[in-house]
Amino acid sequence: MIALIQRVTRASVTVEDEVTGEIGLGLLVLLGVEKEDDEQKANRLCERVLGYRIFSDADGKMNLNVQQAGGSVLVVSQFTLAADTERGMRPSFSGGAAPDRAQALYEYFVERCRQQAINTQTGRFAADMQVELVNDGPVTFWLQV
């Protein structure tokens, strides 16, 4: 399971001219689900995402996690993160989970975030989405479990 996380001052996702999720300060989490992923991996990735200390403390040091910074999380499904890009000029998506399994794990990940008392907004699974964000820093990390 893969999370591309970006520290943002604001982010939103729109589907068919409807804003489905919007946050201020926090993390935009682009989530990719791979074939071998399960709930245990989702738990571990959620723990890492929410615990990752990439917000500045009073001394300007990256030392706070999203909850300590008073932030929110916007989770957007992105199957392209599971692409194999090693060869050729066209990505292969054979490493991605089947759509039903990917959706179940995406929803599980979102629910785990919400259980941690963090405001968690979402896109819409498998929809054509427009994501807007202001990346603060820029600060972007690839987390994989």
Curated annotation (Swiss-Prot):
Extent of motif Gly-cisPro motif, important for rejection of L-amino acids: 137-138
Superkingdom of origin organism: Bacteria
**Gene Ontology molecular function, alphabetical:** D-tyrosyl-tRNA(Tyr) deacylase activity; Gly-tRNA(Ala) deacylase activity; Ser(Gly)-tRNA(Ala) hydrolase activity; tRNA binding
Q: Name one Pfam family in it.
A: Tyr_Deacylase
Supply the alphabetized keyword list.
Cytoplasm, Hydrolase, RNA-binding, tRNA-binding
* Subcellular location per the Swiss-Prot or TrEMBL entry: Cytoplasm
User: What are its E.C. numbers?
Assistant: 3.1.1.96
Q: What class of enzyme is it?
A: hydrolase
Q: What is known of its domains?
A: A Gly-cisPro motif from one monomer fits into the active site of the other monomer to allow specific chiral rejection of L-amino acids.
* Name of the protein: D-aminoacyl-tRNA deacylase
Q: Which gene encodes it?
A: dtd
